[in-house]
C-alpha cells in the first residue's frame, strides 16, 4: 500500500455528520460549518443557516458541472470548480439571498426553479431539481457536460418566463460548498447518461436517414399537430437538426426562449415530424427533439400556444413515469427500437475522419485505454479496432453481412463466405456481396423488386422449391404489383392533400407491429416431419388471413406510401431492397425450414407408408417421389449406394445398433465403428489371458468389467453354459437359460476349439456381408438368424431330435490323434481328479454350478455330457437313443464313438494353431491369429484352461486367481499341443503322454 499522505477522508465523513447536529439545533461549535440536510449547503453563520432551513426546498438539488460554459458577465471565472472553494459562489445562499421575493416558500412558477438556479450558479454549476414542491411539472434533463440542459415542457403559463437576473459576483458567500462528495456521486451517473445520449444520437441519425424522404414529397402533419398554429409545413431538410456539436451559450439559449409563439411553432414543426418515432402509440404530447438526443440547436422555450401539460404527459398510454422523467422514458424507447441498427460503431464510423461525430469517436477514450482497445461490456482488451468491432457484435447481436441469395445474415465476412459456397451450384452466376448491409434497411421498398442486398427474387426461389406433389406452400414474402400500385395511388393522394387528418400508425412502428403480430407458427428444426406438416397445415388458414389484414393495414398508411415512393424514385442504394411485411425475416434456420417444408411437400402419404415397412418403427423409409433419388434418405437427403445401405441408414436415425462386439458386448450403429472399437481388444496374449472369466472363459480388457461379469455368474444372472457360445450374439445369450438346463456344463477345451476368436468372427462376418449385399439381407437379420439357429440346434440335439447337417459346421474337428487320447482318457480323468482337482460333487448334481476345473475335466459325466450333445447334432448321432442316458460309462463310450466317427471329415475342414491349438475355418484367419503369438521364447501353459503366458509369474497369478491351485506347469510346444488339443472331453493332466511336469532343469515347477 502506498505510504503517501492522503487527503483526510475523515473530514468528508464529519461533513456528512454535520446535518444531524445542525438539525437538532446544536450550533454551539462554530468551528465546523453547518450543512443543510436537504441541499447540502454549508453555512458558518448560524443565522444564515436557520434562515436557509426555513426557505430550503424539500427536494435536494442535483448539481452538474458545465465544462464548456462561460459566464457572460464574468469571463475570467474558471470553468471548473476549485477544490478550496473560497471563490466559488454559494448556490443555495444566492438562491435565498432575497427572502421577500420568495416569501419563505417555493415559487409556483415551474420554470423558476431550474432556470433561475441554473443561472445563479455563475456558470459553474447547473442545479436540476427532480421536481418542485408546488408545481411538479418543471425539471431538467441532464444531456451532457458540454450541452447544457433542456427544460421539459412545463404547464401552460400566461407569459414566457422572464429573463434571468445577472448572477452575483463570486465570493459573496463566506463558506465553501462541499463539492467533492457531490461530484463523486454524479460522476458515475453522468457517464451513464452520456452513453445513453450517444446511443440516442446514433438512433436519430438512422431515423433521419429513413425519414428525410418526407421533405421531398411533402410530409404529412404529425399526430401532435399544434392547434392554433396552422398547418405550417417545412421544406427544410431535417438532417441539419442533428448537426455536429457546436458550443452552446446559455445566455443566448435562454434569451431565445422569450421569442414569439409563431416562431416557436415554426421551429417545432420539423421536430414534430419525428414525434411518432419516440411515441410509438401516437400520444399527443409534443416535446423538443433536443430532450431526446443531444441538443445541438438552441432549444426554444415553450410558448402559451403549446397544449402540453403534466397531466397529458402522465396520461400518455406508453409512459407511466413521473412528469420529470417523460423524456428519459422516450429515450429508452427510442434506444430500444434502434439498438440493433446502431450498436455497431464500426459500420457507422466514417473512415476518412470527416463528417459528423460518430459513436466510435466519442467513445474513443473509453474504449482505448493506453492505446489498446477495450470492450465496454466485458472489459476484454483487443489489439486492433477491427477485432473489437467484431467482438462487440457478440454483445449486440448484430449481423451486418447478408447473403444476397437467401437473405441470411452473419456476424463476419468469413462466415458469409462459407455459407455462400452452398449456393455456388445452383446460382453460379451470382457473386457474393462482401459489403455489410445495414439491418435497418430491411424495411425499404425499391423499384427493382428485389430485397436490398439480394440478387435473387424470393418468388423464384419459392417456385423452384415447390413441387406438384402437394403439401403446404409458403406465401410470397414480397408485396404484389397490385399492392405497389395501391401504394402509388396513396402516395399521390397524400402528396395532393399535403397533410393527413388520420395519420394512423407511424411508419417506423409499423415494422415493429408487423413483426409482433406475425404468427409464430413455424416448426422448429427439431419437429418431426409428420407433426410439422400437420402443424403447418392447421395454421395455414389463420396465417393467410393475418397476412392479408397486415397487407391492407400497411398499404393504407400515407407514411408507408411516402417511404415507398422515395426509394423507388431515388434508387441511390447499391443493392435494391424490398420490405417483406408479410413474411418472417431471414434467419440462420431458414434453410432448414425450407428443407423441412420440401420434405413435407414430397408427400406425407409416401412417408407414412414407408415408415411401416422400415426396420425401425420410428424411422421412415425412403420416399418414392420422383424428386428424390432411389436411395436418398428423406430425413437428411443423403444419397446412399444401395437399398440395403439405405435401410441401415434409417436404422441409425431410429437409434438402432445392430453391430455388437463379441468381446465386451457393446453395440454400434455401423460396422466401421465396431472395427475401430475392436482395435482396443487386440492386446498382448498375456494381457488377454489375465482378463478372462474363470467360468465361461469370456475375455475382457477391463478388470472391473470382468469382476462384474463374475458376480453375475455367481448371482445366477448369467448361466454357466450359455455365455460361451461362439456365435449368435445376443440371441445365444437369450437362450442361455434353456441351454444350461438341458445341456449342463460344457468342457472348456471343446468350447475353445469350437468358438473362433473375435478376429475370426469379424473376418467371417465381412465375407458373409459381401454375399449378403447381393441378396439385400441385413447384417442384423443374419446375425440373429445364425444365433437362434445355433442355439436351437444345440438344445434340440440333446433330446434326440433330427437336425440339419449344418449343425456339424459349428463343431470343432481338430482330433487327428483322438484314438490315442481316447485310450488314456480314463486314466487322465482319475489322475486329474486326484492330483489337481478338489473333491468332486455327487454324481447326480449335474445342474449345480461347477468350478472351472470340474467343468473342464468332465467330473461325473458332466464333461462327457457337455461334449456329447455338441457332436450329436449330426444325423448319425441324433439317431442314438442313448443320448439322454445319465450313466457315466455309457456317456463316455458314446463320446468316444462320436469322436472316432468325426475325425476324418473334420480334420480337413478346420485349421488349428500350432501354438495354442485354437481352430480356424480358413487359412487366412489362422495366419491372422498367428500374428498375435510371440515368435521367440517359451510359452508357459496352464494345465487347466490351456492358456499360454510369456512369463511364469503371470501364469502363477492366473492359476491362483482363476483356479485357486498351485500346480506344475510346462513350456508350451508343438509336441505338447497334440495331446492337449486332440482330447475333446477332458483337459490334460501332468501325467499324460508327452507332457512332463519337469521338462527342463532350469525351469522348476514349484516356486
From Swiss-Prot:
Listed InterPro entries: Sal_C2H2-zinc-finger (IPR051565), Znf_C2H2_sf (IPR036236), Znf_C2H2_type (IPR013087)
SMART domains tied to this protein: ZnF_C2H2 (SM00355)
Keyword Nucleus: yes
PROSITE patterns (alphabetical): ZINC_FINGER_C2H2_1, ZINC_FINGER_C2H2_2
Entry-annotated residues carrying Phosphoserine: 243, 797, 802, 806
Bias type Basic and acidic residues, positions: 862-871
Keyword annotations of the record: DNA-binding, Isopeptide bond, Metal-binding, Nucleus, Phosphoprotein, Repeat, Transcription, Transcription regulation, Ubl conjugation, Zinc, Zinc-finger
Matching CDD domains: SUF4-like
Family: Belongs to the sal C2H2-type zinc-finger protein family.
Protein name: Sal-like protein 2
Gene name tied to this protein: SALL2
Amino acid at each position: 500500500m502506498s505510504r503517501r499522505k492522503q487527503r483526510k477522508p475523515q473530514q468528508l465523513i464529519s461533513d456528512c455528520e454535520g446535518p444531524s447536529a445542525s438539525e437538532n439545533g446544536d450550533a454551539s461549535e462554530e468551528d465546523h460549518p453547518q450543512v443543510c440536510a436537504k441541499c447540502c449547503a454549508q453555512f458558518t453563520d448560524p443565522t444564515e443557516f436557520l434562515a436557509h432551513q426555513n426557505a430550503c426546498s424539500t427536494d435536494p438539488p442535483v448539481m452538474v458541472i458545465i465544462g464548456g460554459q462561460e459566464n457572460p458577465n464574468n469571463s475570467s471565472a474558471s470553468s471548473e470548480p476549485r477544490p478550496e472553494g473560497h471563490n466559488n459562489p454559494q448556490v443555495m445562499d444566492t438562491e435565498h439571498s432575497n427572502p421577500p421575493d420568495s416569501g419563505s416558500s417555493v415559487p409556483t412558477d415551474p420554470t423558476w426553479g431550474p432556470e433561475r438556479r441554473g443561472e445563479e450558479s455563475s456558470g459553474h454549476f447547473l442545479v436540476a431539481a427532480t421536481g418542485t414542491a408546488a408545481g411538479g411539472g418543471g425539471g431538467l434533463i441532464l444531456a451532457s457536460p458540454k450541452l447544457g440542459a433542456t427544460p421539459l415542457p412545463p404547464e401552460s403559463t400566461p407569459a414566457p418566463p422572464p429573463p434571468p437576473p445577472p448572477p452575483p459576483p463570486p465570493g459573496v458567500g463566506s463558506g465553501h460548498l462541499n463539492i467533492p462528495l457531490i461530484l463523486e456521486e454524479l460522476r458515475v451517473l453522468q457517464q451513464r447518461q452520456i452513453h445513453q445520449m450517444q446511443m440516442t444520437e446514433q438512433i436519430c441519425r438512422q431515423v433521419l436517414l429513413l425519414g428525410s424522404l418526407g421533405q421531398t414529397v411533402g410530409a404529412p402533419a404529425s399526430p401532435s399537430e399544434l392547434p392554433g398554429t396552422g398547418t405550417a409545413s417545412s421544406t427544410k431538410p431535417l438532417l441539419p437538426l442533428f448537426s455536429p456539436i457546436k458550443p452552446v451559450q446559455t445566455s443566448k439559449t435562454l434569451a431565445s426562449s422569450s421569442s414569439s409563439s409563431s416562431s416557436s411553432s415554426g421551429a417545432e414543426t420539423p421536430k414534430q415530424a419525428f414525434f411518432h418515432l419516440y411515441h410509438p402509440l401516437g400520444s399527443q404530447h409534443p416535446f423538443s427533439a433536443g430532450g431526446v438526443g443531444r441538443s445541438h440547436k438552441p432549444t426554444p422555450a415553450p410558448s402559451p400556444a403549446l397544449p402540453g401539460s403534466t397531466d397529458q404527459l402522465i396520461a400518455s398510454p406508453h409512459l407511466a413515469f413521473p412528469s420529470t422523467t417523460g423524456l428519459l422514458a422516450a429515450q429508452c424507447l427510442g434506444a430500444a427500437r434502434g439498438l440493433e441498427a446502431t450498436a455497431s460503431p464500426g459500420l457507422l464510423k466514417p473512415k476518412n475522419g470527416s463528417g459528423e461525430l460518430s459513436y466510435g469517436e466519442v467513445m474513443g477514450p473509453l474504449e482505448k485505454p493506453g492505446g489498446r482497445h477495450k470492450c465496454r461490456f466485458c472489459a476484454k482488451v483487443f489489439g486492433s479496432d477491427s477485432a473489437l468491432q467484431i467482438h462487440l457484435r457478440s454483445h449486440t447481436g448484430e449481423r451486418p453481412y447478408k447473403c444476397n441469395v437467401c437473405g441470411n445474415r452473419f456476424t463476419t465476412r468469413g462466415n458469409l463466405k462459407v455459407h455462400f459456397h452452398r449456393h455456388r451450384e445452383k446460382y453460379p452466376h451470382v457473386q457474393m456481396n462482401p459489403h455489410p448491409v445495414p439491418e435497418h434497411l430491411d424495411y425499404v421498398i425499391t423499384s427493382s423488386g428485389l430485397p436490398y442486398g439480394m440478387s435473387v427474387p424470393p418468388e423464384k426461389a419459392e417456385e423452384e422449391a415447390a413441387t406438384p406433389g402437394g403439401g403446404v406452400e409458403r406465401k410470397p414474402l414480397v408485396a404484389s404489383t397490385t399492392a405497389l400500385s395501391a401504394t402509388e395511388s396513396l402516395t399521390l393522394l397524400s402528396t395532393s392533400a399535403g397533410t393527413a387528418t388520420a395519420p394512423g400508425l407511424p411508419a417506423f412502428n409499423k415494422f415493429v407491429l408487423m413483426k409482433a403480430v406475425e404468427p409464430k407458427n413455424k416448426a422448429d428444426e427439431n419437429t418431426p416431419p409428420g407433426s410439422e406438416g400437420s402443424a403447418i397445415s392447421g395454421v395455414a388458414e389463420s396465417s393467410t388471413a393475418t397476412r392479408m389484414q397486415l397487407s391492407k393495414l400497411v398499404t393504407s398508411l400515407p407514411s408507408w406510401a411516402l417511404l415507398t415512393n422515395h426509394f423507388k424514385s431515388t434508387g441511390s442504394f447499391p443493392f435494391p431492397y424490398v420490405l417483406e411485411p408479410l413474411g418472417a425475416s431471414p434467419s440462420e434456420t431458414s434453410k432448414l425450414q425450407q428443407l423441412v417444408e420440401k420434405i413435407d411437400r414430397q408427400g406425407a402419404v409416401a412417408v407414412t407408408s414407408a415408415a411401416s415397412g422400415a426396420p425401425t418403427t420410428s424411422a421412415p423409409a425412403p420416399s418414392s417421389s420422383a424428386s428424390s433419388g432411389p436411395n436418398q434418405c428423406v430425413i437428411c437427403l443423403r444419397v446412399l449406394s444401395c437399398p440395403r445401405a439405405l435401410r441401415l441408414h434409417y436404422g441409425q436415425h431410429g437409434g438402432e445398433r445392430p453391430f455388437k462386439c463379441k468381446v465386451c458386448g457393446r453395440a454400434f450403429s455401423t460396422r466401421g465403428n465396431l472395427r475401430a472399437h475392436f482395435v482396443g481388444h487386440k492386446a498382448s496374449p498375456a494381457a488377454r489371458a489375465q482378463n478372462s472369466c474363470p467360468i465361461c472363459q469370456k475375455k475382457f480388457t477391463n478388470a472391473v468389467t470382468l469382476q462384474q461379469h463374475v458376480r453375475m455368474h455367481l448371482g445366477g444372472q448369467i448361466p454357466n453354459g450359455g455365455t460361451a457360445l461362439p456365435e449368435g450374439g445376443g440371441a445365444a445369450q437369450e437362450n442361455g437359460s434353456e441351454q444350461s438346463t438341458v445341456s449342463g456344463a460344457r468342457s472348456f477345451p471343446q468350447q475353445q476349439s469350437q468358438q473362433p476368436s473375435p478376429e475370426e468372427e469379424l473376418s467371417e462376418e465381412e465375407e458373409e456381408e459381401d454375399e449378403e449385399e447381393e441378396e439385400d439381407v441385413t447384417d442384423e437379420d443374419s446375425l440373429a438368424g445364425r444365433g437362434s439357429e445355433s442355439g436351437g440346434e444345440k438344445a434340440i440335439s440333446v433330446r434326440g431330435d433330427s437336425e440339419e447337417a449344418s449343425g456339424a459346421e459349428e463343431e470343432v474337428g481338430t482330433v487327428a490323434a483322438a484314438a490315442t487320447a481316447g485310450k488314456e482318457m480314463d486314466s487322465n480323468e482319475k489322475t486329474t481328479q486326484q492330483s489337481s482337482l478338489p473333491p468332486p460333487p455327487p454324481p447326480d448334481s449335474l445342474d449345480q454350478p461347477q468350478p472351472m476345473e470340474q467343468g473342464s475335466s468332465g467330473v461325473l459325466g458332466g464333461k462327457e455330457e457337455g461334449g456329447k450333445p455338441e457332436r450329436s447334432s449330426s444325423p448319425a448321432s441324433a439317431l442314438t437313443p442313448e443320448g439322454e442316458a445319465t450313466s457315466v460309462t455309457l456317456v463316455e463310450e458314446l463320446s468316444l464313438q462320436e469322436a472316432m466317427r468325426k475325425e476324418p471329415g473334420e480334420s480337413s475342414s478346420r485349421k488349428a494353431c500350432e501354438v495354442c491349438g485354437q481352430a480356424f475355418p480358413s487359412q487366412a484367419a489362422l495366419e491372422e491369429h498367428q500374428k498375435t503369438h510371440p515368435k521367440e521364447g517359451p510359452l508357459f501353459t496352464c494345465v487347466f484352461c490351456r492358456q499360454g503366458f510369456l512369463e511364469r509369474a503371470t501364469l502363477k497369478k492366473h492359476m491362483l486367481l482363476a483356479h485357486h491351485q498351485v500346480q506344475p506347469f510346462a513350456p508350451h510346444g508343438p509336441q505338447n499341443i497334440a495331446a492337449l488339443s486332440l482330447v475333446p472331453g477332458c483337459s490334460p493332466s501332468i501325467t499324460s503322454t508327452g507332457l512332463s511336469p519337469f521338462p527342463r532343469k532350469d525351469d522348476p515347477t514349484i516356486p
